[in-house]
Amino acid sequence: MRPLTPRQAEILELIKRNISDTGMPPTRAEIARRLGFKSANAAEEHLKALAKKGCIEIIPGTSRGIRLTQEEPEEVELGLPLIGQVAAGEPILAQEHVEQHYKVDPAMFRPSADFLLRVRGDSMKDIGILEGDLLAVHKSQQARNGQVVVARVEDDVTVKRFEKKGNKVFLHAENEEYSPIEVDLANQSLSIEGLAVGVIRNGDWQ
């Protein structure tokens, strides 16, 4: 990797710290405000330079579309964080939610996994996602119809199959005993925390 300027190193550290503290990268406006830039455009130019040097990937179309391309040595050593119970209103990757780390290669999944989520309940059993399994999740704020997502509805985090129709989102279970969760985007809060990219049987890691 080409060496970074002091300002680029400062921005990269800010991005890493924001992801560590909140589970998501900062917006351009947040970077500009924290580092004293006059506009978000100045932050964007530095982000482009970091992308050219291979430190980050810029994902178009979203205000937080920044992805680190190189894992820190500590992260490689620790492995993927396992997320247990998620407290209402807290970022899913907040440190207090991490039960432990598993030495799983993120690249064994496509796209690569960013964290593991302990499955609770049997609402997705018909596609082999069972109680106690570890769901490999790729962080993403966007989803296409038919994808299995980790979604936050108001303060509840759930794993369901995503379907959007107009101004409504339906979160479908893969178990006929459960009705779809209907979310009216005009009146309810919904965010996508990530996409399911694989399942690890809990018994495989005892």
UniProtKB/Swiss-Prot annotation:
> What are the residue positions of the site described as Cleavage?
88-89
Top-rank taxon of the source lineage equals Bacteria
> GO: which molecular function terms?
DNA binding; serine-type endopeptidase activity
The active site lies at 123 (for autocatalytic cleavage activity), 160 (for autocatalytic cleavage activity)
Q: Which reaction does it catalyse?
A: Hydrolysis of Ala-|-Gly bond in repressor LexA
Q: Name one GO biological process term.
A: proteolysis
Keywords, sorted A to Z: Autocatalytic cleavage, DNA damage, DNA repair, DNA replication, DNA-binding, Hydrolase, Repressor, SOS response, Transcription, Transcription regulation
**InterPro entries in alphabetical order:** LexA, LexA-like, LexA/Signal_pep-like_sf, LexA_DNA-bd_dom, LexA_repressor, Peptidase_S24_LexA, Peptidase_S24_S26A/B/C, WH-like_DNA-bd_sf
Checking CDD domains in the record gives: S24_LexA-like
Asked whether the UniProt record includes Transcription regulation among its keywords, one would answer yes
**Which Pfam family name is an example for this entry?**
LexA_DNA_bind
Tell me the DNA-binding residue spans. 28-48
- EC number(s) given by UniProt: 3.4.21.88
Q: How does it assemble?
A: Homodimer.
What functional role does this protein have?
Answer: Represses a number of genes involved in the response to DNA damage (SOS response), including recA and lexA. In the presence of single-stranded DNA, RecA interacts with LexA causing an autocatalytic cleavage which disrupts the DNA-binding part of LexA, leading to derepression of the SOS regulon and eventually DNA repair.
Family that this chain belongs to: Belongs to the peptidase S24 family.
Q: What protein name does the entry list?
A: LexA repressor
Q: Which organism is it from?
A: Shewanella piezotolerans (strain WP3 / JCM 13877)
Question: Could you tell me the gene encoding this protein?
Answer: lexA
